[in-house]
Each structure stands twice: as structure tokens, then as C-alpha cells.
Amino acid sequence: MAGFKRGYDGKIAGLYDLDKTLGRGHFAVVKLARHVFTGEKVAVKVIDKTKLDTLATGHLFQEVRCMKLVQHPNIVRLYEVIDTQTKLYLILELGDGGDMFDYIMKHEEGLNEDLAKKYFAQIVHAISYCHKLHVVHRDLKPENVVFFEKQGLVKLTDFGFSNKFQPGKKLTTSCGSLAYSAPEILLGDEYDAPAVDIWSLGVILFMLVCGQPPFQEANDSETLTMIMDCKYTVPPRVSAGCRDLITRMLQRDPKRRASLEEIESHPWLQGVDPSPATKYNIPLVSYKNLSEEEHNSIIQRMVLGDIADRDAIVEALETNRYNHITATYFLLAERILREKQEKEIQTRSASPSNIKAQFRQSWPTKIDVPQDLEDDLTATPLSHATVPQSPARAGDNVLNGHRSKGLCDPAKKDELPELAGPALSTVPPASMKPAASGRKCLFRVEEDEEEDEEDKKPVSLSTQVVLRRKPSVTNRLTSRKSAPVLNQIFEEGESDDEFDMDENLPPKLSRLKMNIASPGTVHKRYHRRKSQGRGSSCSSSETSDDDSESRRRLDKDSGFAYSWHRRDSSEGPPGSEGDGGGQSKPSSGGGVDKASPGEQGTGGGSQGGSGGTPSGTAGSSRRCAGPDSSSPSPASASAAPRGAELVQSLKLVSLCLGSQLHGAKYILDPQKALFSSVKVQEKSTWKMCISAPGPSPSADLDPVRTKKLRNNALQLPLCEKTISVNIQRSRKEGLLCASSPASCCHVI
């Protein structure tokens, strides 16, 4: 097995995978381990019995008996005992926050009293429980108090010096640690068992609020003298109530020390829950705390896993065997309770408004566009298909809350959770008229993860077109964290090499997808979104290695911030303000989601263009939104074959947006573009141009403003590999497209 080391007995092989060493003692070593059947992490205390004398062996088995007896939320749980000829394995609950001594040492002046009160109350609660069972710990110290951060608890551990006692009868064994031991133990006298734990509690409280032990001198002799004289100094910053409680516990005479009942009722400890543990806090102290349904479910899992039959499981639980059967049962039970507790916390934290917004974002409204439509996007009416969903995708989308992309009437957005049918078919409002053949379209390149190949049912729409680019398989599992199942289902068995080998892909396997929304719908949704804000983002920044280092946002109060981003970005409908990728503010433009340096090119949004290689070589790109953009340019016609262009489009990010350029009005000011609209950081050979069909816009401009114009295009050097462009919005339409001829913005 993975963690099995030479020298360990075969009884533990196959049950636990032993990992790194957590700590060492004189006779024992504590290792991190994983329970094979449940996968839960545990601590395994491995004790070498060959090194133990008779007295130490007696203490060892006394520890086991006491730990079996005490089962409390504030005491580290013993799951299993494996006894072999040479070693004894104690399978214990694993703490995740270190011990209290290290925690105190990080606070030179001690903890604030509210926090100290919280932890001390839990320790008192655990010791009170032990004393009621007539078990004395006798080695209470901060090193034996372990933090469990996920549970918000502290727990007692190391019952190596613990013992059973009878009320009224005194013990004689001298044990414990000098700095925390009561005077009567150090003298070797007979002592009252509960009183020695009270003394140790006083030392622990002193350390919590003061940051150092009360009796800690240069050597053991001086320390012993201070303990016998009961001399210590409480700093003045400690409150009177806390000082009084410490004094009541650190009494030289055991008969004058406070009892546990007096400590629990002390005024300083009032107002704090002595045990924040609830039913769902682990460890589970008894199988009787589970419901009948949970109990039967766990037994059924164990039977199916060939752990034991039902009768053997029930018998082991009723007799407290502390064997592998009971360990497996309680580890499974605690995992179920932990998941149930986390689910309840999430349910309480989710407000109805958040849930409603999440469902609004979740319904997919995307269609496939065959390859032949990409060459004539503006002249050919686009078809809107009904896209049947697989049950896995339908459930995953609803749960994971990805933002929908148009095609739905704003008045019906709140009804999206009820549209749980296998197909989605949305008809535009009757008032919406199909646009003329010369209508303007806005293109945006995005990644998507769906492979829908269903037939299309044409519906004439005034449209907004969004080209979507599939991410590569290498980015598949990191591009959207919230849909791991779908990431695994998609393209099973494919590799990046297969992409490069596919020279001619059929239209339905095209990576470029389209999404349609009517401008009226988008306009209405823009105002709706602007008034109500937006949900949280689920954007993943792990798509490329360089992604997180080069991210930028636009935080302008006016205008429209352009961004390209992954499918998992929490984006609103095109034209809505502040719904870009990442986690931008509701009133700001969308954040810019950069690709890695080798991913930028000029595919033009539709196969064309092969420029933008990692070396920065410029290529050509055809116009993507103008009325005459149906035919490729000679440069793109002479480029690589269609299959190669498709592969290139998977690797290169194209920036293509519909905008307007009329008269003497520039979208990017030639004078200020390098310092305002385009953010600069590092040098590059990339250039950006904004061009428009028709007459040259430079006719009415003075030479100073047109010095950067070449071939009817404004060319600007860019100093980073991803750009942010701020576009002014048309107030009348609320869209980027206006009534003037459309133009393109290319990275060339």
C-alpha cells in the first residue's frame, strides 16, 4: 500500500495508509494516516512495546482503557486499537490546528480574555466530564490541548498518565510535568485525584491570559521552590475576575482549591457556552446519536464494502469493540454528519434573492452555427435552434449558476427555474421585427464547453451574434471549477494531438459557437440589471499560467468596457453595464480576462487570420461586421487550410467588436489612446487598428490628429499583450451598434 513502511505489522496493511511522521516520543511515534475504506485522515500512534518496562506497559494499557471510557466532543476520539506482538497502534482523531502551547507562544502577552474564556471553558467542560466518570488526567498542560479549527473546538489528548479513581480514596503515583504539577504530587504524598487537575487548570488559564507559565524559572530546582511556595505574579492587565479565578485554583492547600462546580459557576466564566459542540460536531461519541435512517445507511455501506455483515457490525457497536468495524462505522458517520452540517450552513447563508439570481443565471441559451454560416453572418438570417439538454448538464447548470445569455424575455427571467423541460425554445416578443439585411451585429469571442449537435429550427430574429471559441483540452478541467462532471464527460479520450491532426472538420464539429439575443431584449435587460445589481462571479483564473499575472479591470463610471472572458465568467447580457468577467463592481465595466502570451491572434472571430503567433508575427484578418464582410481577404484566403485555421483559432484569442466610426469622431483618440483608453505595461510589437468601410474618416481631420492614420485605419502600438478598450455607448439604443455602418477593431 502507498504508506506502508517496512517494519510495520501486517495487521495494519490494507486498513490504513501510513504517511509522514507528526511527532515522536520516548516509546511512540505519531503518524498521519488515511483510512482506506472511507478515505478519512487519522492520526496513528505507533507504540513499540519492546521498549516498555512493566510500569510503562501498565500505563499504556491504562491509557487505552481510559480513552475507551471517555467519549466527549472536547476529547480526542480513539477509533481503534490494533495490538500486535511488538507494537500497539492507537487510531486517533486528527487535529488540524496544532497544540495550545504553540498557539500561546505566538501571543507574548497572552490572548484577549474573551478568547481565553472560550477555550478555557471547553477544557473545564472536558475535565468535568472525565471526573464524573471517575477518570483523572494527571497530565494537563497546553501541549496536551489540541486545536480543531474546522470544528472551532479545543480537545484534550494524551491520557498516558490518566487513571481511574474512587471518590474519597487518594492516589499515590507521582506523574506529570514539573511546571504544571500540583505541590502534593511533587512531594510524593498521597493526593486527592480531582484536586491535581484543578491545579493544572489554574496553570493553563494563567498561560492563556499572560502568555507564560506562572512557575518557570532558570532551572528545575528554582521552579520547584516557586511551586512549593505558590509564588507567582499576575500582570496588571488581567481583569479582576480572571485574577480571582486563577487565585482560587492555584492554592497550596488542596482543600482550599475551587471545585469544578465552583469554577463553572464563577462570574468570569459566565456568558460563554462551555461546549459549543452540537449534534453535528465530530467526533460522534455514540451511534445512538444518529437517526435510524442514518444508522441503517452506514451499515448498508459497510456490508456492501465487505467490511462485515450486519450482525457483526451491530454486535461490535453494542460491545464497544474498538476494532476496524467500529472505526469504519464512526468515520463514515462523522463524514455524513459533517456533510449535513455544511449543507445546513450553506442553506442558512443563501437568501431567497441570491437563490433567485442564481437560477436566473443558470439557464443555457446557446445555439450551434454551422461552419458555412460564418462566411456570411450579416447577409444570411440566423437560425435559432431548440437545444435539448442532457440531465447531467441541466442539473449542473441550475446548481452552479452560470449566467444566461439572452434569448429569454426579461419578464420571464424569474420563471427560469421552472423551465426544467428537456428542450429550450424561446420566441421573441411580437413587437420585435426582424432587422433588415444590412443590420449591424456585435461579435464577441468567448470560450464555451458545450458540444451540441442537434438540428436547428430557424426562427427569424433581430440578432446579436456572439462567436464562442472552445477551450483546449489542456484547459478543460481548470476553465470552469463549478462543472467538474461536465468537464470529465466532454471529449473523453481526446487529446491536444488529436486537435492538430484534424485537418478538415465537419461543420457540426466546429469550435465556433453563436449566441443570439434580440437588441430589444438586451436593452431591457440592461436597465433591469443596472437597477438590481448582479450575482457573484464564478470566474476561474486558472486557464493559463500567465493569466493571473496579467489581469486588469476597467472601473469607469461611464461608457462601456470591452472585455473578452471565459464561459464561466459571471457576465450579463451584451450591453449590460458591469457584467464582465471576474468580479467587477456593478457600476463598472467588465474586467479583462487575459489569455497567455501565446494565445493572442487575429482569428477575426471566424476562422480568418493567422497572425498573432507567440513570436508576435503579424498576420491578416478579414473584416467581421461590415456589410461587405462575407468574403475573406486575399491574405486570409492564402492562409493555412480551414482545419489549420480552426486549430489556430483554438489557440489564439481574437478581438472583434462592432462599433461606430463616423465623421470626425474617433472611438480611440489618437492623442490620448496610449495613456487612457489603452493600458500599457510591457513592450510588444502588437498594433491595434480601428477601421471602417466607406469613405476615409480622415478627410475632415487636421494633420496632427491623423498622423497615426494609415490606410484608413488608426494604428496604435500596444505595450501589453492584452488590451482594454473603452467604448462610448449610444444612449438611445443602449448598445454598441448604432445606425451608421459597422466597423471592426482588430489586433493585427
From Swiss-Prot:
It comes from the Eukaryota. Residues 383-415, 491-640 are annotated as: Disordered. The keyword Transport does not apply. Keywords: ATP-binding, Kinase, Magnesium, Metal-binding, Methylation, Nucleotide-binding, Nucleus, Phosphoprotein, Serine/threonine-protein kinase, Transferase. Residues 549-558 have a biased composition (Basic and acidic residues). The keyword Nucleus applies. Autophosphorylated. Phosphorylation on Thr-173 by STK11/LKB1 in complex with STE20-related adapter-alpha (STRADA) pseudo kinase and CAB39. Residues 291-334 form the UBA domain. GO terms for biological process: protein phosphorylation. InterPro entries: Kinase-like_dom_sf, Prot_kinase_dom, Protein_kinase_ATP_BS, Ser/Thr_kinase_AS, UBA. Residues 491-503 have a biased composition (Acidic residues). Its EC number is 2.7.11.1. It catalyses: L-seryl-[protein] + ATP = O-phospho-L-seryl-[protein] + ADP + H(+); L-threonyl-[protein] + ATP = O-phospho-L-threonyl-[protein] + ADP + H(+). The active site is at 139 (proton acceptor). It is an enzyme of class 2 (transferase). Belongs to the protein kinase superfamily. CAMK Ser/Thr protein kinase family. This is SNF-related serine/threonine-protein kinase. The lineage of its organism: Eukaryota, Metazoa, Chordata, Craniata, Vertebrata.
